[in-house]
């Protein structure tokens, strides 16, 4: 077991920004990521992307190339295709890679695991041909491929519209969008417009308007404020049934992509016992962080979307802020001018975030699905079974887990955890924060007893 000044978990924008700066300032840094290379989800495969594919994915994607090169040149130790399956508050990280199990120790830990797509259980979401928009985008980034049309995208959020525009750039024309954003979202978002017009906010708004203009110009059908969604099997693929303005609609599809925005990936912070709070605007639990981005657990820092959704640029800046906080805590000198400038840049890039959070709030119907909808895919538990357990006396997600095994499968509650919280809140008429969340215990990823037994300490 080696001792590092810092272990960075995640090699997306936040992990890249942090580990590069740490290593450049003489810190001994280990960076781990489950992917084959750096970049995270947003910059996946950017090192070897073709020019043709880069044009499809856009300038924001290609901006990651220079950051990845800086990481490679920084001197940080990079360990890819590596899973962190157990993390301990004092800095011990249990890792699994192609060589087996090993332990590493960090004087400081930085969690930069990014975001995950908000699970959106609805009738038919487990059918063949139904996947997430994020999954389809990974296919485009890694292989330059898209499924054959017609393709129907269901959901809302910036990534929802970005991927639709990328589909157009890749040559797909048989495309329809069903926007599920809450009907009153625009009204609730209006009060945040003035703040969004400050700092870097206008650049984000212009980018979004350009995406919508591209889709409208191409004649893509967009069905706004839709509900009562159902996906059914059909002889030639899939059928999507929904209601818009009290009118029933039906679309044929070969594939369906689901997306209800992204939320922080908080399994590691929760496993470490970091204090969490419910963000009403973000619609998710966020870890508490101080001005240095340190969590409530001493020595554990959280940067990027894992601490709150802000996008790639904010994640990169937060990685650098966390790195400076770590350096200062280790007694290393930091550039105070750079620190202040980075904080200003971060605030400028977050100016439009409240507007976006309110504009793309998911519909309540998505958060509390019908009884017949499968909530836990791993253990095949329906929303009706969860409601019955809650009415029978289960206080919240953890008691439901004990009775029905929700959250005990391979995904460890990543797919059903938010639904459990939503159903507990609605059934008991309490807030999401009071309903709470699943307690996370190691192993965080599936691992065999044989692999643990084969652990050999150097």
From Swiss-Prot:
Which EC number applies? 1.-.-.-
Functional pathway:
Opine metabolism; octopine degradation
- InterPro entries the UniProt entry points to: BFD-like_2Fe2S-bd_dom_sf, FAD/NAD-bd_sf, FAD/NAD-binding_dom, Metab_Enz_Cyan_OpOx_G3PDH, Opine_Oxase_asu/HCN_bsu, SoxA_A3
Instruction: Reply yes or no: does the keyword DNA repair apply.
Output: no
Top-level taxon:
Bacteria
A Pfam family the protein falls into: SO_alpha_A3
Quaternary structure, from the entry: Heterodimer of a subunit A and a subunit B.
Function in brief: Oxidative cleavage of octopine into L-arginine and pyruvate.
PANTHER family noted in UniProt: ANAEROBIC GLYCEROL-3-PHOSPHATE DEHYDROGENASE SUBUNIT B
Identify this protein by name: Opine oxidase subunit A
Organism of provenance: Rhizobium meliloti (strain 1021)
Name the gene that codes for it. ooxA
